[in-house]
């Protein structure tokens, strides 16, 4: 088991190149199953979840290669297997995205009920009901979601009972090869959905309205190959901006897009940060000041992203004043708070609300990561705390942040990865 050792009291300064968005790369990789010709993807981050996805695709018969420049080449023309097995799926909830393209193109598919972060219920019901509305028959059996359709999926009007990024993507992918028109209402609007739709359209799909709450898909007979660059990771961008804010530093995030982060930038400015944006960069300068507390309420895009909640919880714990954080997207997503309290933070949890009281400083401690975004908040806390912080279970971080210790060291952090076994010996 690997851990991070972080030495604190670092003021983070410099520039950092933002990686491609994991939350766009994953559905796009699975969407490549739909293509009957080769696909080339660039700006694909090197992450555990990406590695798992590529293993699943290889298991299905997709020819996968990552070249010397980091581009991923996919050839799904000879898929001969239609089951995403438990041993691969168990670590990653996003693997449910394999089902829709398999059913759409091959009229059958099986995916083991998935695993992933421990942040409450993320049921696959909306994925299943969407496929059923398109004409698929679904059986839950032996721990697998099994789907099939006699001829082809048929377009229809689907009103999402709740806004769901994952289900919107599944339905959109499936509808590309369905007969007729599919209209998805109350669709999620995240930039990653827009990027996936752009990729599908490059392959020959007919999708309009991605990025709005109504997406229309006119089914086509086949999809071909294309080249596509994954959109920059807005959550990684936001994470480094928070790192500058809590450390009184200045960080320029390069190769990113400010127009996907309006809600986050607004809150950082409210906290007292100076934020400057260009077409491809965002720079935050805290001017050596301590941030002001800001209230946060997570919401579907374009609202405040739930994936930035843990980072802003940390910001509020070292800010001037008291703040209220309300989590409306996922249950059980405050597991980082007890760990931050171990470091001297002050907060109370009441249902889906946390009340944070800013303190002058945090103190290093041994803490345990519980999910991807919680884990990065603990690492950043270690960067600014007094003393030494040990962060356990950092495999969560490797699922979603590319070369995180290298990037943090480039900004002045003192952080090292070590094996628990070597420490004990």
Swiss-Prot record:
Signal peptide: none annotated. Its EC number is 2.5.1.7. Its main location: cytoplasm. It is found in: Cytoplasm. UDP-N-acetyl-alpha-D-glucosamine binds at residues 93, 122-126, 162-165, 307, 329. GO terms for biological process: cell division; cell wall organization; peptidoglycan biosynthetic process; regulation of cell shape; UDP-N-acetylgalactosamine biosynthetic process. Keywords: Cell cycle, Cell division, Cell shape, Cell wall biogenesis/degradation, Cytoplasm, Peptidoglycan synthesis, Pyruvate, Transferase. It catalyses: phosphoenolpyruvate + UDP-N-acetyl-alpha-D-glucosamine = UDP-N-acetyl-3-O-(1-carboxyvinyl)-alpha-D-glucosamine + phosphate. InterPro entries: Enolpyruvate_Tfrase_dom (IPR001986), Enolpyruvate_Tfrase_sf (IPR036968), MurA_subfamily (IPR050068), RNA3'P_cycl/enolpyr_Trfase_a/b (IPR013792), UDP_GlcNAc_COvinyl_MurA (IPR005750). Pathway: Cell wall biogenesis; peptidoglycan biosynthesis. Disulfide bonds: none annotated. One of its GO terms (molecular function) is UDP-N-acetylglucosamine 1-carboxyvinyltransferase activity. The modification 2-(S-cysteinyl)pyruvic acid O-phosphothioketal is found at residue 117. One of its GO terms (cellular component) is cytoplasm. It is an enzyme of class 2 (transferase). Pfam families: EPSP_synthase. Phosphoenolpyruvate binds at residues 22-23. The active site is at 117 (proton donor). Cell wall formation. Adds enolpyruvyl to UDP-N-acetylglucosamine. Belongs to the EPSP synthase family. MurA subfamily. This is UDP-N-acetylglucosamine 1-carboxyvinyltransferase.
